[in-house]
Amino acid sequence: MIKISKRNGSSLKTTLYYVRLKTYDNNQLFELEDATAVDTSKTHASLAKIVADELLQVSVHHRNIKLDQWVLEPNSLHALISVEEDRPNLEVKGKPRSLTSFIAALKAATAKRINLMRNQPGSSVWQRSYNEQRVEDEMMLMRLRKKLSESEHVVIAG
């Protein structure tokens, strides 16, 4: 989904991406456990809240990034993210720099806080890379929004 908008007299290209981050070794970090395991359940819920808080916080600091919809599952984060590109006429191959920067900041902030909470400094929280897919049209956007809203394993969503 691409649209051109004007901000301060310059053209911007806005592109929507579906992004998926997976936990390291597909660990179920954010899974809510059996109610009898109160301490474990609280830890998982707290880790999920860290990711939710940092997702919102990091998006505030990246002016080119807007969160459309997101879902945190036990071992992954799925999000629809719009990216405004300052130079739409510049042909750039690969992942958009502002999206990559946003993901790197999110991973670093969440990993630091999660590792402090687990008392495991330096441990891997997320897989090295992430998956992204450009949303090409309204049908694809509707399908992805439905997929996110109907996910069976949602721990927390926004």
Across the structure, where does each feature detected by a protein language model lie?
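Short catalytic/metal-binding and nucleic-acid-binding patches
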Residues: M1-G158
